[in-house]
């Protein structure tokens, strides 16, 4: 076999032409300090704020402080295996979480990783956790109601789709119950719900998930959890992960409800990180940008205009108060960012008024324009009546010689308070809310004993379901009150069948 020099030279030339030298250039730094969930690294001069960084053991971190000599990093995972002198390299990416329909029904952590033991989440879509909120011209006015199923909220402080309504109160006043009941009521409302649990006990989150599963609400709910036992960076990031998942649905024309339970714990986690990163403390030791921490999160809730699909994110942020002090730093910040607040009071809660909503301090700045016409008609004077009753109640403690008109107002007020009470995890459809409020306003309850009011409501709902479902259907579909003569006749007919407990 003869070797041809031309062939060999052509093969060598071909291989030289096809050779490409690919140099991978990456910025690599060295860990100079590690502890308490944060690290400092030297040599990452080109790192960007919020950029993901990778440690030599595969754990990720996020650049927070860009200083002259080093970079302050919050660590997104276990930090016990990281040592001083370890390598840390730039990734050129910012943090993203998985998004899409595959997340519905799952429980995930702040990084979007499943923690429910049901296997991996099959989705390829991701979104950055930090995004610019929709601008003024991309939005439209709130004009659709979000029915919570809670009479005291839908009647007194209505919430619209795209609104941000703060729920504020001391611990153990039923804040989480309000959120869970609102999620349960979205079953047939074409709404996707995201429940973000920040700094909760793992047993509490488990109970919430089981409640949602028991009522079939996990079919349209995503749970994002950063438990109290997890590092502060994960508590800080959890709300942003939740709203990023929500934005995917909103920009596809869907309606989303996001519950942040609660932002006080997120602010405390951010304070911890900021102090560890040696940022100067301000009021109550919070850093100077703690207002921006919450404003950039809550501004991402919006009702988009029709050209963008008309989707919405409704935000229900929670803030925990200490001994009812709503003038503390974080409560006043979030009150000024949101479109209203629902104040839950421990005195009312322990006196048996549940949900313990203080109608005087609670307000909805935009939801009234989204209330259905029937509800607006029957609930118009309810807030004033309740305020007058509270005033008379405190006044009546000093004297017993009250005139007939005052006594009548007090009796009506007692029945109003009783009507607004509601059992746990039993949200009420809006047509049935309208029915009982109509009966209250039109004096059908004036001669019903106070302790029988809730039984009257329950029996009336059952009676209307069987005898006049068309009236309920009319309220549901037209969103207006049916013919008053028919409604009055039906209510009188039911009233004649109702037997007070004394006469049984």
Swiss-Prot record:
The protein's Enzyme Commission number: 7.1.2.2
Record note on quaternary structure: F-type ATPases have 2 components, CF(1) - the catalytic core - and CF(0) - the membrane proton channel. CF(1) has five subunits: alpha(3), beta(3), gamma(1), delta(1), epsilon(1). CF(0) has three main subunits: a(1), b(2) and c(9-12). The alpha and beta chains form an alternating ring which encloses part of the gamma chain. CF(1) is attached to CF(0) by a central stalk formed by the gamma and epsilon chains, while a peripheral stalk is formed by the delta and b chains.
Domain of life: Bacteria
Membrane topology (UniProt): Peripheral membrane protein
Family matches, as Pfam families: ATP-synt_ab, ATP-synt_ab_C, ATP-synt_ab_N
Organism annotation: Listeria monocytogenes serovar 1/2a (strain ATCC BAA-679 / EGD-e)
Matches recorded under NCBIfam families: atpA (TIGR00962), PRK13343.1 (NF009884)
Name recorded for this polypeptide: ATP synthase subunit alpha 2
InterPro entries linked to this entry: ATP_synth_asu-like_sf (IPR023366), ATP_synth_asu_C (IPR000793), ATP_synth_asu_C_sf (IPR038376), ATP_synth_F1_a_nt-bd_dom (IPR033732), ATP_synth_F1_asu (IPR005294), ATPase_a/bsu_AS (IPR020003), ATPase_F1/V1/A1_a/bsu_N (IPR004100), ATPase_F1/V1/A1_a/bsu_N_sf (IPR036121)
UniProt key word Cell membrane: yes
The reaction(s) this protein catalyses: ATP + H2O + 4 H(+)(in) = ADP + phosphate + 5 H(+)(out)
Gene Ontology molecular function, alphabetical: ADP binding; ATP binding; proton-transporting ATP synthase activity, rotational mechanism
Annotated CDD domains: ATP-synt_F1_alpha_C, ATP-synt_F1_alpha_N, F1-ATPase_alpha_CD
Cell compartments where the protein resides: Cell membrane
HAMAP family listed in its UniProt record: ATP_synth_alpha_bact
């Amino acid at each position: 076999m003869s070797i041809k020099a031309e062939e060999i030279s052509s093969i060598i030339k071909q291989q030289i032409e096809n050779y490409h030298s690919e140099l991978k250039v990456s910025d690599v730094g060295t860990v100079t300090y590690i502890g308490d969930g944060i690290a400092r690294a030297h040599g990452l001069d080109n790192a960007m704020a919020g950029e993901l960084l990778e440690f030599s053991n595969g754990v990720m971190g996020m650049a927070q402080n860009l200083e002259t000599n080093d970079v302050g990093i919050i660590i997104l995972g276990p930090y016990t295996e990281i040592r001083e002198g370890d390598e840390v390299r730039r990734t050129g990416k910012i943090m993203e979480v998985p998004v899409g329909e595959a997340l519905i029904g799952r429980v995930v952590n702040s990084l979007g990783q499943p923690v429910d033991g049901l296997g991996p989440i099959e989705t390829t879509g991701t979104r950055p956790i930090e995004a610019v909120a929709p601008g003024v011209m991309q939005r439209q006015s709130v004009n659709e109601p979000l029915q919570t199923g809670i009479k005291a909220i839908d009647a007194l402080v209505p919430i619209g789709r795209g609104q941000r309504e703060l729920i504020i109160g001391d611990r153990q006043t039923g804040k989480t119950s309000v959120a869970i009941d609102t999620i349960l009521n979205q079953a047939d409302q074409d709404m996707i719900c995201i429940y973000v649990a920040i700094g909760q006990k793992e047993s509490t989150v488990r109970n919430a998930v089981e409640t949602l599963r028991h009522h079939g609400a996990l079919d349209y709910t995503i749970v994002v959890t950063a438990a109290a036992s997890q590092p502060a960076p994960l508590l800080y990031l959890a709300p942003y992960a939740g709203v990023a998942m929500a934005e995917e649905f909103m920009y596809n024309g869907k309606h989303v409800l996001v519950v942040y339970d609660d932002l006080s714990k997120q602010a405390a986690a951010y304070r911890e990180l900021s102090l560890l990163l040696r940022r100067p403390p301000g009021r109550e030791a919070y850093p100077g940008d703690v207002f921006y921490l919450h404003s950039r999160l809550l501004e991402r809730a919006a009702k988009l205009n029709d050209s963008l699909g008309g989707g919405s994110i409704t935000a229900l942020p929670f803030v925990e108060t200490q001994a009812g002090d709503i003038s503390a730093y974080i409560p006043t910040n979030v009150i000024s960012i949101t479109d209203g607040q629902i104040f839950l009071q421990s005195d009312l809660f322990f006196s048996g008024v549940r949900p313990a909503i203080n109608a005087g301090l609670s307000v909805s700045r935009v939801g009234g324009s989204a209330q259905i016409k029937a509800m607006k008609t029957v609930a118009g004077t309810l807030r004033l009546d309740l305020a007058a009753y509270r005033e008379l109640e405190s006044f009546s403690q000093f004297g017993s010689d009250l005139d007939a008109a005052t006594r009548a107002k007090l009796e009506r007020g007692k029945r109003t308070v009783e009507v607004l009470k509601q059992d746990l995890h039993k949200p009420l459809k809006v047509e049935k809310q309208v029915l009982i409020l109509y009966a209250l306003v039109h004096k059908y309850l004036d001669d019903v004993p106070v302790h029988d009011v809730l039984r009257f409501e329950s029996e009336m709902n059952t009676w209307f379901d069987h005898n006049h479902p068309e009236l309920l259907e009319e309220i549901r579909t037209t969103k207006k009150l049916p013919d008053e003569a028919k409604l009055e006749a039906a209510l009188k007919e039911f009233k004649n069948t109702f037997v007070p407990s004394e006469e049984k």
